[in-house]
Curated annotation (Swiss-Prot):
Domain ATP-grasp: 109-302
Pathway: Cell wall biogenesis; peptidoglycan biosynthesis
Official protein name in the record: D-alanine--D-alanine ligase
Record-listed Mg(2+) 1 binding positions: D253, E269
Source organism of this protein record: Dinoroseobacter shibae (strain DSM 16493 / NCIMB 14021 / DFL 12)
């Protein structure tokens, strides 16, 4: 560690946000919220919009810690974590390996399966294969295997004659995953403990707008589900956090088909840098267990280190 975060009463924090991924707007919102909370907690916070000159700016600023509020590619996939390790600047959230692994949905699911966690059937297919025929019986979901925030996600409903026309900016290889009907559940893990289960209620598909537009979804916490399903979500989220090697906070998303009871539960993905916007799930879950937003942000900073 180049600088000892714990030895300073109020470390100088670089709030790294923005970046160039498709999730830039979400990242800016998270960064602004966290920056304001940390300033209220007495920290010196410097806003840092990550761009091509990031390494030089970090060397000039010489922060005691980097709060990584980036989302999506480059900021959440191990790339910027590697830069911070190289510069020996303590940083928040997961390290290089866990970030890269969790960002790759196919490898994440392989890690889940190896740990005995329940998953939905899925595979990687080219755009040409998807366009030519159904690669699995509908309903199924098409999504990039290395993006978050439901960017570029398509739901192919039961009875559809063909897959939808895909946006030109999507990659050539995509994940296709069997759609699990029912409810969307999610669990935040802080350190090594699960906080609670939230049931995400929407009018339709839980897409980008449902996640980030006020009123786009309703969050019920604690989720009103059977006790064995609730306990399984909590335990599975902790296991996912551990087997992926996550640090700090993570959030694991599930689908649950109530018709199949506990057998209807499937892990979708683990987010190593959960959103911290006004409509985000992780701050709500922390508040539910008595940890206010400012205290959560403080904990994240105090947890920062190198060699994560």
């Amino acid at each position: 560690m180049r600088r000892d975060v714990s030895s300073k009463a109020s470390p100088k924090v670089a709030m790294m946000m923005g970046g160039t991924s498709s999730e830039r707007a979400v990242s800016l919102s998270s960064g602004r919220e966290c920056g304001a909370a940390l300033r209220a907690e007495g920290f010196e916070v410097i806003d840092l919009d990550a761009g091509p000159d990031l390494a030089a700016r970090l060397e000039d600023l010489r922060p005691d810690v980097v709060f990584n509020a980036l989302h999506g590619r480059w900021g959440e996939d191990g790339c910027v974590q590697g830069l911070l390790e190289w510069l020996r600047i303590p940083y928040t959230h997961s390290g290089v390996l866990a970030s890269a692994l969790a960002m790759d949905k196919e490898r994440t699911k392989a890690a889940y399966a190896a740990a005995g966690l329940p998953i939905a059937t899925s595979g990687l297919f080219t755009r040409a294969q998807i366009a030519a025929r159904h690669v699995m019986p509908p309903p199924y979901v098409i999504k990039p295997y290395n993006e978050g925030s439901s960017v570029g996600v398509y739901l192919v409903p039961e009875g559809a004659e063909a897959a939808p026309e895909l946006a030109d900016d999507l990659p050539d290889t995509l994940m296709v995953e069997a759609f699990v009907p029912g409810r969307e559940l999610t669990v935040t893990v802080q350190g090594d403990r699960a906080l609670c289960v939230t049931d995400i209620v929407t009018e339709g598909w839980y897409d980008y707008d449902a996640k980030y537009v006020p009123g786009g979804s309703r969050h019920v916490l604690p989720a009103e589900v059977p006790g064995d399903v609730y306990d399984a979500c909590m335990a599975h989220a902790e296991t996912a956090h551990r087997v992926l090697g996550c640090r700090g906070i993570s959030r694991t998303d599930f689908r649950w088909d109530p018709r199949r009871s506990l057998d209807g539960l499937a892990l979708l993905e683990t987010n190593t840098q959960p959103g911290m916007t006004p409509t985000s799930l992780t701050p709500e879950q922390a508040q539910h267990v008595g940890l206010g937003f400012g205290a959560l942000c403080r904990w994240i900073v105090e947890d920062a280190s190198c060699d994560r």
